[in-house]
């Protein structure tokens, strides 16, 4: 019969193995793995560029995060992403960044990041922020000011709104994935291609078909 210490050791090893199995962005197995965007190889992520061809510029991006972006759209916000898709040096490093500009009363509408937790820092202005848990849908919200931070747990529906009627606001988000992904709830439901069946949506939202038709007819503009 195995000793108690052996059983404890086995349990610990199994726990460590299962933790690795459920990790979204696994720890890198080399110093770096700059993404080779031209490679025909398809993997869960991106293959590595030849390390002998890597130079300092692969770890640099002139993101100009100090420059304001246009918020001339229906929602009054603009999200500028810095992730592995436009910064290959982030490949396997499990991190990305975003600048969010808000017009007066602008909104970053309810959305989720399926692969990342988000830490938001307010750089300018005052924001109303919040997230909704899984069922039974509890809301956690807060008014945050310049210098404040707020965290949105992974895959939770969340949002931000600039409360000022006259001044823009700016925030910066850090995310613990090289490619967090984003699903904007309204446009995903009413602007999917091909569209979701009216029968599904009328029952789900408990409204008449004409309401669903009107919502589907809207131009669901992206702020990304």
Swiss-Prot record:
Location of the protein in the cell: Secreted, Extracellular space, Apoplast
Protein name: Germin-like protein 8-4
Function: Plays a role in broad-spectrum disease resistance. Probably has no oxalate oxidase activity even if the active site is conserved.
Binding residues annotated for Mn(2+), in chain numbering: 111, 113, 118, 158
Misc note: Member of the 12 germin-like protein gene cluster located on chromosome 8 in the major-effect quantitative trait loci (QTL) for fungal blast resistance. Partial suppression of the 12 germin-like protein genes increases susceptibility to the fungal pathogens causing rice blast and sheath blight diseases.
InterPro entries: Cupin_1 (IPR006045), Germin (IPR001929), Germin_Mn-BS (IPR019780), RmlC-like_jellyroll (IPR014710), RmlC_Cupin_sf (IPR011051)
GO molecular function annotations of the record: manganese ion binding
A GO cellular-component term linked to this record: apoplast
Signal sequence segment: 1-23
Quaternary state and interactors: Oligomer (believed to be a pentamer but probably hexamer).
Lineage: Eukaryota, Viridiplantae, Streptophyta, Embryophyta, Tracheophyta
Main localization category: secreted
Key word Transmembrane present: no
Keyword Cell division: no
Glycosylation-annotated residues: 78
CDD domains listed in its UniProt record: cupin_OxOx
Disulfide cross-links: 33-48
